[in-house]
Amino acid sequence: MKIHYLQHDDLVQACTIEQWATEQGILLSNTQVHKGEAFPDTSDFDLLVILGGRMGAYEEEDYPWLIDEKAFIKRAIAENKYVLGVCLGAQILAHVLGGLVHPHVHKEIGWWPVHFSPQIECTLLQGLPETVHLFEFHGDTFKLPTGVKLLASSAGCENQAFIYNDRVLAVQFHPEVSVEKTKVLAQAAGNVEGPYSQPAAHYMNEQAHFEQSREVMFTILCNFKEQIKLAEVML
C-alpha cells in the first residue's frame, strides 16, 4: 500500500498519519501544493490524503494552485482511487463533488463530541465509537454534494463527515493531530471568541483526547488498508 498526501500549509502536517505509516511499513509521499510542487501520477499511490490549511476551498483567486489541485483530485476520484479529505481537504472534496463551501456562522475550535450515525454503514469508519471527542479547527463549512451520505455531526457543525462511492471519505474534524503540532497551530491562531471556540489553554490540556484521536486515525487508516487489499483481490 502506498499513501500520497497533499499539504497546503506548513503548520498543518500529517502527524499521526505519518506515525501510522511508519509503524505499518507503508510507503508515504507528499506534494506541498502551496509551494508549487508537481502532482504524482495517480498510479503511484493507493490512497490519496488531502490535509487541511488556513485558506478557504473557494479562494482560488488568492491561491490559484487550488485550481490544479482540484483537477488532480477529480482525476483521482474518476479513476476510482481511495481518498481521505481532512478539514480543508473535506471542503475541497465537497467542492469537487458539486457542493457549496462557505464561511460558517461561527468557528469550531477545540475538542467537541462528534456523533457518528449508526444508521449508515461505512466500512471505512468500522470500529469507531458512536460518539467521540475530536479536534476541530475551522471557520468554513459546506453543503452536502448530491450522491454523498452524511456520516457524522456535531453540535457546532452539522456536516462532520461524508462518504462518496464507498471510496471517498471526507472528515471535517482533525483525527491526525499531535500535541506538538497543535501547540504550534494554537500559537499562530491565538484565542478565538465564540460559542464553539475553546481557549488554547483548555484544548491543549486534553491528553486523553489526543490519544483517542490517534486511535480514531489509526482505525480509519487500517480500514482503508483492508479495503484496498480487498479491492486488489477483486481485480
Regions found by a protein language model. Name each.
Residues L27-S29, L100, H133, K149:
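Conserved beta-strand segments of alpha/beta enzyme cores
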Residues K35-F39, I109, F142, E158-N159:
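A short acidic, often aromatic-flanked loop/helix-cap motif at beta-alpha or helix-coil junctions
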Residues D9-D10, H106, A155:
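Short coil/turn segments
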Residues C15-T16, E59-E61, A94-V96, T146, ...:
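Short glycine-/acidic-enriched loop or helix-start segments at secondary-structure transitions
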Residues W20-E23, P64-D68, V101-H102, S153, ...:
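Glycine-rich, phosphate-binding/catalytic loops in enzymes
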Residues Y5, A78, F116-L235:
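Amide-donor transfer/coupling interface in amidating biosynthetic enzymes
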Residues I50-I120:
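Cysteine-nucleophile active-site neighborhood
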